[in-house]
């Protein structure tokens, strides 16, 4: 494999996989030697640092993770400041519907259903206390499992998850419409 292709693949893996990943896991995925992976990771870390990019690759023992640079903390903090009195966006509603019907579920599984990244939606749902961390999945990387909260049930006027409309005859694409309808009904009742 071409070295530039390997670097691009590693960058994609680190971006998609938010948890630290070991050089041996990267090697297995890319079907290259661990020594080659470590050499390429060293080069990539140096390149990211040399160009002072907004993101960096950090190394923790034999694990690697992509993160933002500390000097952009204040800027990023503004992005994640709680937005008061804002409703849920379409993306947040879709993400919430997927979590409600398929919990416990990982971020990767949610993104697989939605077809797009869901970091902002998950952050918003956590901020509004509609979802919570339900532990870790026992597989490589131990991704977080998400589920809905009691606050979710209260806000949507549900006694339990069994009160969610049944989707046996409804296709998966309409899950978010069900949550949106419940959400809109609750807003009208206030």
Swiss-Prot record:
InterPro entries: ScpB_csome_segregation (IPR005234), WH-like_DNA-bd_sf (IPR036388), WH_DNA-bd_sf (IPR036390). Its main location: cytoplasm. It holds the Pfam family SMC_ScpB. It comes from the Bacteria. GO terms for biological process: cell division; chromosome separation; DNA replication. GO terms for cellular component: cytoplasm. Keywords: Cell cycle, Cell division, Chromosome partition, Cytoplasm. It is found in: Cytoplasm. Participates in chromosomal partition during cell division. May act via the formation of a condensin-like complex containing Smc and ScpA that pull DNA away from mid-cell into both cell halves. Belongs to the ScpB family. Homodimer. Homodimerization may be required to stabilize the binding of ScpA to the Smc head domains. Component of a cohesin-like complex composed of ScpA, ScpB and the Smc homodimer, in which ScpA and ScpB bind to the head domain of Smc. The presence of the three proteins is required for the association of the complex with DNA. This is Segregation and condensation protein B. It comes from Alkaliphilus metalliredigens (strain QYMF).
